[in-house]
């Protein structure tokens, strides 16, 4: 998932190098130039306070509300979509739509390539006619730049647009299916390689607070069916112990830049009471399951007994679960009639929400999203969105890309158009002030064309503990603060499924006539309202 406006002068033209026959000049650290950089390159670092809140340098709570944009991890050597659209313009659109943070999947392999100055294994997938800025000559149809040069242009543009960045190691090896590998190492790239890559990256950008965070590894997972490929969470130093690996790598990263936020994801499984990691996944004679299972990277049950310990860097720790809906996988908690309350009871609380609820550490939902199906998947997205708003859970929506097979994206038509219906669902969960201005995580740079800076927000008298709007607008089914034909369509889709169910009887936007029941009469009333008839919709305060 990208945005900016010019004031904080760009990073000194990093790596404006050119590709030679077989080699590229090694990446040079920016540390030597730190003395000449303005203080505004170091004033946006974030940390965690004693209340498990992410706060800025002045102790003001912030809300990270971003999206994911992949490509570097799959072999494109650039963001996907730059093969057709202008990269700068897409970043500008992301900023203008209110996303203040980008989670960008990478691989250990590409970071080590950049660290060593190795040539691109393939030409970056850039349309040099729509992206003349990404060519050596700066002209349409020119020679495409080295991928690290292009990356640094993206960092520069994000800074100018007010977007902050977090990379994640999506996989050790660059591959479109790399995320299927359960661990952070392979036969080709070791745990040490992974640590080296992230330590180099942290050091390289330690004087640029555009890079605010690192997500150490995407979705550690695996089950007891293949024990040597199962990410576990305990107090051992075993090579597959994710807790130990995360603490080790985080120490390397924070030694280079102690100001970075470090995101630690969960595992897939954790042993049930009375069992340990030696247990099989299931006893097929009795069909007894010995592990609690959930989404890849979404299981933090181990952190209750074995919390992540970053020592003197504990203030930089954020736990980062992932959560998805039934169109990704029909999990057992997606039974008929599931609600936000049943999801919290059956999945969310014991797997991850306890960490924030008990004040252990803040949460950033690193991936959530899916197709707009007018049914169960959309219900799940709405429930999770509302839960994150209510509890101020940080998040990065999956994803900007249209080419995510499990979920689709925020754009379509070869990255050329926005899915306005999906964006309307996400928009209420983006950080905004009372006037609907999107809030940047940068103290001096506003977020895109429709936002304000962090200093503008707190300087205008906004409370650091601003609560979400509790007013429920009748007819605003998708919670975008508008009542229009999209809401009418959703009500028509929901009528058969939701009529007379308990969770729409109180303070429901679908109960437009205020009689406590969602029925065809509510759809008729909304239709009349949209046609300009002299009718009144009932609103509530929750």
Predicted regions and their residues:
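Sec-dependent N-terminal signal peptides of Gram-positive bacterial secreted proteins and lipoproteins
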Residues: 2-28
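Cellulosome-associated attachment modules in secreted, modular CAZymes
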Residues: 21, 25-31, 464-542
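Structural recognition of the beta-strand scaffold that forms the well-ordered cores
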Residues: 62-69, 100-106, 110, 164-171, ...
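Surface-exposed, active-site-proximal loop segments in enzymatic domains
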Residues: 75-81, 110-146, 175-189, 225-232, ...
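Extracellular glycoside hydrolase catalytic/binding regions
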Residues: 83, 185, 195-212, 217-391
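Aromatic-lined carbohydrate-binding surfaces of glycoside hydrolases
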Residues: 106-114, 151-155, 160, 164-184, ...
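Aromatic-rich peripheral "rim/lid" segments of glycoside hydrolase catalytic domains that contact
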Residues: 375-470
